[in-house]
């Protein structure tokens, strides 16, 4: 089943024509997906006006930062998350604080390697904490973009359903 989910998510096209797997618009200024190549970064800038990137890959990938900045991304940020362990609440809050600036600081794109597990979990957190979605609705979106529990990813889902409390991540005005 997980292999089918993965293959399906890799093959779907997005309406923006941005050549990035699992690419989608979250809000008018927040986008999500997999690790872009050069064409992906150009597409982000040219097709949807992204100017900032937040990489959530566990270890900073210098080549990714260089690729993004060379393509014209004006700000690249790294906040490390594991794709096998429950996220640290402080890191989740840091990520939320950063993406919540997209309306005032410029459109942004957040990504992990495949745009499924870390990205899916954090976008689900955002959907529940800021958009009023239920956890079930947010998990449905995770599934749409290729979520699967196999290969050690189950702790992320367990954290989301059993430990994540949206009240702990509310936006402070």
Model-assigned labels for residue ranges:
Residues 115:
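Substrate/cofactor-recognition hotspot
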Residues 118:
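Conserved lysine of the Walker
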């Amino acid at each position: 089943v997980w292999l089918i989910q993965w293959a399906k998510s890799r093959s779907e096209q997005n309406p923006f024509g941005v050549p990035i797997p699992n690419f989608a618009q979250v809000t008018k200024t927040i986008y999500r997906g997999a690790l872009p190549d050069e064409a992906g970064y150009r597409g982000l800038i040219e097709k949807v006006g992204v100017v900032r990137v937040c990489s959530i890959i566990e270890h900073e990938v210098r080549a990714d930062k260089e690729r993004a900045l060379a393509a014209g991304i004006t700000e690249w940020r790294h906040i490390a998350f594991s794709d096998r362990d429950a996220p640290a609440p402080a890191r989740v809050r840091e990520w939320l604080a950063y993406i919540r600036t997209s309306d005032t600081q410029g459109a942004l794109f957040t990504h992990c390697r495949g745009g499924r597990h870390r990205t899916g979990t954090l976008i689900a957190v955002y959907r529940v904490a800021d958009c009023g979605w239920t956890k079930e609705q947010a998990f449905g979106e995770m599934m749409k973009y290729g979520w699967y529990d196999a290969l050690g990813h189950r702790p992320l889902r367990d954290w989301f359903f059993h430990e994540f409390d949206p009240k702990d991540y509310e936006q402070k005005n």
